[in-house]
């Protein structure tokens, strides 16, 4: 008899049940009944003592039969102010439809999001990385407070993906991710109908400043770069993380390359219901999938595809959520043995929609598995191993030009390089594809704010004939605060034709859309007294990717003098403001965030 059918009667069996303590954890055990799927939600749907909980659930439209079903929290990062996210409510509705058809109860809820592209180059960018941890916190909060048995998350923009994975790792209940999907390429009518994307819009600014394009061409680019819903199209951060998460096994096959507006994405959403039911039946949790080997596969694929440097701190943070220690040197070890094969933007020619047309991520992973580059033994959200998932996947067409063969790589080793030295004793992350060379020596031009750099560029103060290392500092996780991305400065440099004569280093981050000679994630950051805060205009800086060095050519005596000067300015309150003196959400973030080499996590107990 269902509890809801007692109508005031209290049989002895139920009196006994109502006094029995129900565990709030997820014990592993054998239970052949269908109700075994609701191991968590039955803490509120079954006990007589939780009648008020049940009354609230009936008010949502649940039936008496529904009270015995597993409940799935469907968390979407939907908001209509960003193309990466504006379609996610539609996808969430389709996911719920699939969940209900699978005989489960689907409850939809939302979490926060920040558009990197809209906030880029403004103070709004300070909220971007912080949103990753807010997403994780909010999903964890709802999953814990509402007693849902499983989670399906639907992210779209850059920080969404690691945020939902961190929540899945913390909660550790059966979970899977449905990626919102990639946008279609745009088309520039004034440039022979060339394919364009969001990075084209960023670079158009520098091209306009130098007279390479007219105002009419510039407007044509920004008006047509983004033709609809979906994440930015190249191997930028969103597609990088989605691809990494697919190879780790936390999505259904093809999720990372299925375009946002496609039948394939629609079918994927519907299939998520049966997939999550199998995970519940077999008690497969994120901790069973997100193993050390899964993270090895992810690091390999990030290097193979020329993916975003943001993957370094995001994968470290996701690993931390499941108790796996990943550090920046792990990325270097993988990079040293992994070739760069993908001719994908930002450094290459093609976008994710092009990869989808030749078989997508599944065909890429099959190619890598056949070549022995990745390990296929790990469990995935299908309930099968990665290798099993790839058995019937078609090979790439013989004439495809997007993914190079191992015998003819773009670069024999990976593009992600971990550099240390007198400027970055705690590490830094370089994005070195080889096109910009592997060594750069130049004179420092220092800016405490990216707006000051843009103003200098507009005044034509950065000369093409001079080797310059642009230093943008006080942009770290505590200093920014929020470790904003430097896509606007890096794109402006490239657009202005300064990519070969200028390098850019920062204690902030770079967008997945950035390319050029770029070093970010410098630890320690300027706000906490890192050496980058001691650099002055005219100092010689050496970047050597082969020796993995980031050095400041200033003797120890002079550095000691500068440090005393810096400390005096700090004590007098004359340094740039950091998050450490702020209130509100950014101040709270600055006081809890770890450095970039430790993933910028905010829930550390150390």
Curated annotation (Swiss-Prot):
Give the pathway listed in the UniProt entry for this protein.
Amino-acid biosynthesis; L-isoleucine biosynthesis; L-isoleucine from 2-oxobutanoate: step 3/4; Amino-acid biosynthesis; L-valine biosynthesis; L-valine from pyruvate: step 3/4
InterPro entries on file: DHAD_IlvD/Edd, Dihydro-acid_dehy_C, DihydroxyA_deHydtase, DiOHA_6PGluconate_deHydtase_CS, ILV_EDD_C, ILV_EDD_N, IlvD/EDD_N
The reaction(s) catalysed by this protein are: (2R)-2,3-dihydroxy-3-methylbutanoate = 3-methyl-2-oxobutanoate + H2O; (2R,3R)-2,3-dihydroxy-3-methylpentanoate = (S)-3-methyl-2-oxopentanoate + H2O
- Cofactor(s) listed in the protein's UniProt record: [2Fe-2S] cluster; Mg(2+)
Mind giving the lineage of the organism this protein is from?
Eukaryota, Fungi, Dikarya, Ascomycota, Pezizomycotina
Native source organism of the sequence: Aspergillus fumigatus (strain ATCC MYA-4609 / CBS 101355 / FGSC A1100 / Af293)
Q: What is this protein called?
A: Dihydroxy-acid dehydratase ilvC, mitochondrial
Q: Where is the active site?
A: 511
The entry assigns this protein to a family as follows:
Belongs to the IlvD/Edd family.
One GO cellular component assignment for this chain's record is: mitochondrion
A single GO molecular-function term is: metal ion binding
Domain of life according to the entry:
Eukaryota
Tell where it localizes. Answer: Mitochondrion
Q: Which SUPFAM superfamilies match?
A: IlvD/EDD N-terminal domain-like, LeuD/IlvD-like
Q: How is its cofactor bound, per UniProt?
A: Binds 1 [2Fe-2S] cluster per subunit.
Q: What does this protein do?
A: Dihydroxyacid dehydratase that catalyzes the third step in the common pathway leading to biosynthesis of branched-chain amino acids. Catalyzes the dehydration of (2R,3R)-2,3-dihydroxy-3-methylpentanoate (2,3-dihydroxy-3-methylvalerate) into 2-oxo-3-methylpentanoate (2-oxo-3-methylvalerate) and of (2R)-2,3-dihydroxy-3-methylbutanoate (2,3-dihydroxyisovalerate) into 2-oxo-3-methylbutanoate (2-oxoisovalerate), the penultimate precursor to L-isoleucine and L-valine, respectively.
Q: Which PANTHER family match?
A: DIHYDROXY-ACID DEHYDRATASE DAD, DIHYDROXY-ACID DEHYDRATASE, MITOCHONDRIAL
Describe activation and inhibition of this protein.
DHAD activity is inhibited in dose-dependent manner by 2-hydroxy-3-methylbutyric acid with an IC(50) of about 8 mM.
Q: Which UniProt keywords apply?
A: 2Fe-2S, Amino-acid biosynthesis, Branched-chain amino acid biosynthesis, Iron, Iron-sulfur, Lyase, Magnesium, Metal-binding, Mitochondrion, Virulence
Residues recorded as binding Mg(2+), renumbered to this chain, are 116, 158, 485
What the entry lists under NCBIfam families is as follows:
ilvD, PRK00911.1
